[in-house]
Amino acid sequence: MSSSEVKANGWTAVPVSAKAIVDSLGKLGDVSSYSVEDIAFPAADKLVAEAQAFVKARLSPETYNHSMRVFYWGTVIARRLLPEQAKDLSPSTWALTCLLHDVGTAEAYFTSTRMSFDIYGGIKAMEVLKVLGSSTDQAEAVAEAIIRHEDVGVDGNITFLGQLIQLATLYDNVGAYDGIDDFGSWVDDTTRNSINTAFPRHGWCSWFACTVRKEESNKPWCHTTHIPQFDKQMEANTLMKPWE
């Protein structure tokens, strides 16, 4: 594994606790306003385009739009939190992670396995990416991040890619992070409006809360139970309420 692959595919180790990262920095970079047009989605990459078509054919419209919003939230958050790692991260690797992170909730897979949706989804994503021509390193980086995207906590480390997908999904789903009081303001109002307008929420928080309850009912051992009252946290998401 080359050092360039480590950086491009987000393998750099960071604390699993985003609060620990913030505390070590002292302050985040200055906030900037963006429109969706200001942030380039790597649609010209054939692999990304094929993965996008794959998920669009399988995910619900609500989940697809969530996945796209996550790409933009994460891009903005990364630039403020860890700009050096953000600069080196491949936009394609990030886009693939976002597009595929909830593939385990697709109807074709959600009830066809006893595995937790995030763990099965990571394995499925790796299989799909290898078939589509991804490098092994990139496919494994995406899989690792997806498998750990609900693995929030305070102890240990995670890949930068894994931390970023955690932060971006929590931003969209909950709008809050335990111990980080200003988490909602990590993305400014103008940017938040642009992203939510470009990829409408269609009642996402309520919709995905129902998905969480369904998984926890069908699979009481599932990894989603690691996040206490995740469904209720989503339904209490005041940050995104104006666009729900």
From Swiss-Prot:
It comes from Albifimbria verrucaria. It catalyses: urea = cyanamide + H2O. The keyword DNA-binding does not apply. The keyword Lyase applies. This enzyme is highly specific for cyanamide. GO terms for biological process: cyanamide metabolic process. Its EC number is 4.2.1.69. It holds the Pfam family HD. Optimum pH is 7.7. Residues 63-174 form the HD domain. Cyanamide hydratase involved in the detoxification and/or utilization of cyanamide, a toxic nitrile compound distributed widely in the environment. Compounds that react with thiol groups, such as Ag+, p-chloromercuribenzoate, and iodoacetamide show a strong inhibitory effect on cyanamide hydratase activity. The enzymatic activity is also sensitive to chelating agents such as EDTA or o-phenanthroline, as well as to reagents containing structural elements of cyanamide, such as urea, dicyandiamide, azide, hydroxylamine, thiocyanate, or cyanate. This is Cyanamide hydratase. It comes from the Eukaryota. Homohexamer. Belongs to the cyanamide dehydrase family. Its cofactor is Zn(2+). Transgenic plants expressing CAH acquire resistance to toxic cyanamide. Moreover, due to its innate ability to convert cyanamide to urea and the broad-spectrum antimicrobial activity of cyanamide, the CAH gene can be used to facilitate plant growth promotion and biocontrol of phytopathogens. GO terms for molecular function: cyanamide hydratase activity; zinc ion binding. Optimum temperature is 55 degrees Celsius. Keywords: Lyase, Zinc.
